């Protein structure tokens, strides 16, 4: 603790040599013996005055508030300092550590990338031998149904199943038959 009663952080304290401490103790003991002999020679009133003065000073210090802010480094700065001071086996990796900081930090608030429109993506062939032009697809981006531009024309006039029925000449058969399996998915979305 310093004279104001504030704890000093360990990283602020200076390391003293044991030899220097011994020299200080010797200097203190020689100066205290000379000062004690001077005090003995002076009268007792001056000794009590100095004691009272020191007590008054201590009381004033106890009543006063001193502000001594502690300087703290962020954890990233501490890590950087530790990396710089580390000259062991991993010291040769320091160029790679510097390159790691160049990457842009990921934006966690950004959600998943938006899905492209069904019309913009390449579609795979329909299942069970269905007709690609007869498909109606729901687009998550547009939130609507998409179909081929010639959907109606193709399904009514060009569809191979309907063409076979017309070739037989039974128009009643067309009306009474359920839709073919290829086109049935159009009605059950």
Curated annotation (Swiss-Prot):
Compositional bias annotation for Basic and acidic residues: 1-15
Start-end of Acidic residues biased regions: 16-29, 46-56
Pfam family, one: DUF4637
Protein name: Uncharacterized protein C17orf50 homolog
InterPro entries given in the database record: DUF4637
Compositional bias annotation for Polar residues: 65-77
Region of interest (Disordered), ranges: 1-77
